[in-house]
């Protein structure tokens, strides 16, 4: 496997300059090519995304998850107690944006309850179309062909940049220590090795990256998890039994030992990210002077190399029956499977927010499964998000949650209905 030869810290590579397509004004931890500059950014950011920081944000995350639950249960059929149908790709995007805006900026935008700012999610998705192409085919930037090819995507980008710039500017007018948020940390933290801090442009760049990455990737993982759980009833019943035996009611779900012991639920999330990775394409690295050997092959300097995450996640050498949803593979301490698992990338460039993201995913999935019974919407709506036998190449897997790679993933569905458990218990008693 070429993955260790490309992504480990000793590889003679650096991040491809293609990622500059994602850059605005200043480099960020995702786009910085220089290893020293990246290391400095990572050390500063890691202070604000440590395990202790994640635990401190637990109540904030849970607050928004409960708001999503309140939204869902507010529109139910009085006879059946089942809710109206919800496209969870949209609602999870609103949820994760609300969480990230609160955690990063201390700002409650409440996309879950108010449509005023929901255009921001559309702007992120629309902007990523152009960016995704430029990362894979930077030739499209020659003579600014991207302006002709992606005018709508550029408009979306400008809309998002304007929004995030005003958000940062508004936040910078308040004193850093007045709020317990990540941007307060970014404004004051210093690199432990150099003593260097972030400029205001760098704070804006890192904050924007956290918002986009935290919104898109987590919402995709949540939508994929509920897709697969409702596609595989036996797995759904096992996950439900696990979390409901650990928590009597949804309000009891919180970060800590009881949630950590829900190992099958975590396995369901990990298997969902294996089958439908939120960022599925190759993470490009450029070979430096002296070359690099990859899986026994000598690669010359200047070449861009990478491993496609979707491809390695579906390689039967690491995952027998690779297109089957099998959470049990993550309960077997299979080092082969773990070595190929890359939803958060690997090595020194791996996602700095992995711990935060997994805490968020576990809180959301466990809370929803404790509070609600879940089913697919009836009719054609219930098929949204899955493949079709008559679909184009690569889209015929009925049991696979379909994603479109635009740096992160564009998705639709699953469309679900929810029923509060306490209403079922009450009607049975009557």
From Swiss-Prot:
Names of the cofactor(s): heme
Domain of life where this protein originates: Eukaryota
Keywords, comma-separated and alphabetical: Heme, Iron, Metal-binding, Monooxygenase, Oxidoreductase
Chain positions recorded as heme binding sites: 351
EC number(s) from the headed UniProt entry: 1.-.-.-
SUPFAM superfamilies hit by this protein: Cytochrome P450 (SSF48264)
Pathway participation: Mycotoxin biosynthesis
GO MF: heme binding; iron ion binding; monooxygenase activity; oxidoreductase activity, acting on paired donors, with incorporation or reduction of molecular oxygen
Pfam families: p450
PROSITE patterns documented for this protein: CYTOCHROME_P450
Function: Cytochrome P450 monooxygenase; part of the gene cluster that mediates the biosynthesis of gramillins A and B, bicyclic lipopeptides that induce cell death in maize leaves but not in wheat leaves. The nonribosomal peptide synthetase GRA1 incorporates respectively a glutamic adic (Glu), a leucine (Leu), a serine (Ser), a hydroxyglutamine (HOGln), a 2-amino decanoic acid, and 2 cysteins (CysB and CysA). The biosynthesis of 2-amino decanoic acid incorporated in gramillins could be initiated by a fatty acid synthase composed of the alpha and beta subunits FGSG_00036 and FGSG_11656.
Family according to the record: Belongs to the cytochrome P450 family.
UniProt name for this protein: Cytochrome P450 monooxygenase FGSG_15680
Origin organism lineage: Eukaryota, Fungi, Dikarya, Ascomycota, Pezizomycotina
